[in-house]
From Swiss-Prot:
Pfam families: Ribosomal_S2. The lineage of its organism: Bacteria, Pseudomonadati, Pseudomonadota, Alphaproteobacteria, Hyphomicrobiales. This is Small ribosomal subunit protein uS2. CDD domains: RPS2. Gene3D superfamilies: Glucose-6-phosphate isomerase like protein, domain 1, Helix hairpin bin.
Length: 271
C-alpha cells in the first residue's frame, strides 16, 4: 500500500472549503480563511492540503511503530462514519458520549471494560444458570457498556495519537489528551479555536461528505502503516487470505489554486 492520495478537487466536491456564517467565526481562524461568500467564510484549501498530508503521514508513521490511533467524533453525522473508519483500519473509536476521565482515569475505565468482557463471555454462553429476567438485565448492561466503551475495548492502554472531528464538541477529550501528552490531530472549522491542537487541519466539520472523506483518508493512512509494519517483519501481504485492497482513486489532475476553483465573487477576509 501507499499513503492515501487526494486532490484539491476532491476536497472541493466534499465541501471542505465551506466554513460557518461569518458572524459565528472564531477570529483565531483568520489565517486559515481565504474570504467570504454570501456571509459564509471560505476556508483556504491551499493551506488545508499540506496540513492534511502531514497528518496522514503522522498516522501512518504512528501505526508502523505499533502505536494506537483513537478516532473521536460523537456528533450525529460523524458517529457511524467514525466507527466504520476505525474498525476497518484496526484502530479504536469513541462515537457516543465522551465519558469524563476516559483517558485520564484509565484504571477505572479498564475496570468497566473488564466488566464488558465478562458480560460478553456470560452471554456468549447463553447466560446459562440465569433467569430470563436476569439475562435481560445482563443484555441491557452489556448494551450500555458497549455503546460507551465498545470502540476502545481492545485498545489495552491510552492511545498514541488522537484524531478528532469537531474540537468544540470534543473539548473534554482534547483536554484529557493534552494532560497526558497525547498528540491531537483535528479538523478545525471556522468557529473553532486552533490553539492547543498539535496538528490542525482547516476544513468543514459538519458536512457528511467532508467527514466521510477525512475518515476514509485517515483509515487508509492507518492501513498503510499496518502494511509497512508487516512488510518490515517480512510478512507476504499477497499470501494473506485477505490481503489489503487499495481503493481505486479517480485520477483528477488539478493544476489550479483554491482561489481559481472558488467563484470570483468571494471576498477576501481581513485579518
Amino acid at each position: 500500500m501507499a499513503l492515501p492520495d487526494f486532490t484539491m478537487r476532491q476536497l472541493l466536491e466534499a465541501g471542505v472549503h465551506f466554513g460557518h456564517q461569518t458572524q459565528r467565526w472564531n477570529p483565531k481562524m483568520a489565517r486559515y480563511i481565504y474570504g467570504q461568500r454570501n456571509n459564509v467564510h471560505i476556508i483556504d484549501l491551499s493551506q488545508t492540503v499540506p496540513l492534511l498530508y502531514q497528518a496522514l503521514k503522522l498516522v501512518s508513521d504512528t501505526v508502523v511503530r505499533g502505536g494506537r490511533v483513537l478516532f473521536v467524533g460523537t456528533k450525529r453525522q460523524a458517529s457511524d462514519i467514525i466507527a466504520d473508519a476505525a474498525s476497518r483500519s484496526a484502530q479504536y473509536h469513541v462515537n457516543a458520549r465522551w465519558l469524563g476521565g476516559m483517558l485520564t482515569n484509565w484504571k477505572t475505565i479498564s475496570n468497566s471494560i473488564h466488566r464488558l468482557r465478562k458480560l460478553d463471555k456470560i452471554l456468549a454462553a447463553e447466560a446459562r444458570g440465569f433467569t430470563k429476567k436476569e439475562r435481560l438485565n445482563l443484555e441491557r448492561d452489556r448494551e450500555k457498556l458497549n455503546r460507551a466503551l465498545g470502540g476502545i475495548k481492545d485498545m489495552g492502554s491510552i492511545p498514541d495519537l488522537m484524531f478528532v472531528i469537531d474540537t468544540n464538541k470534543e473539548n473534554i477529550a482534547i483536554q484529557e489528551a493534552k494532560r497526558l501528552g497525547i498528540p491531537v490531530v483535528a479538523i478545525i472549522d471556522t468557529n473553532c479555536d486552533p490553539d492547543g491542537i498539535d496538528y490542525p487541519i482547516p476544513g468543514n466539520d459538519d458536512a457528511s461528505r467532508a467527514i466521510s472523506l477525512y475518515c476514509d483518508l485517515f483509515a487508509r493512512a492507518a492501513l498503510d502503516g499496518i502494511a509497512r509494519q508487516q512488510g518490515a517483519m517480512g510478512v507476504d501481504l499477497g499470501a494473506q487470505a485477505y490481503a489489503p485492497i487499495e481503493p481505486v482513486l479517480e485520477d483528477v489532475a488539478v493544476d489550479t489554486s483554491a482561489a481559481d476553483l472558488i467563484s470570483e465573487d468571494t471576498t477576501p477576509v481581513s485579518n
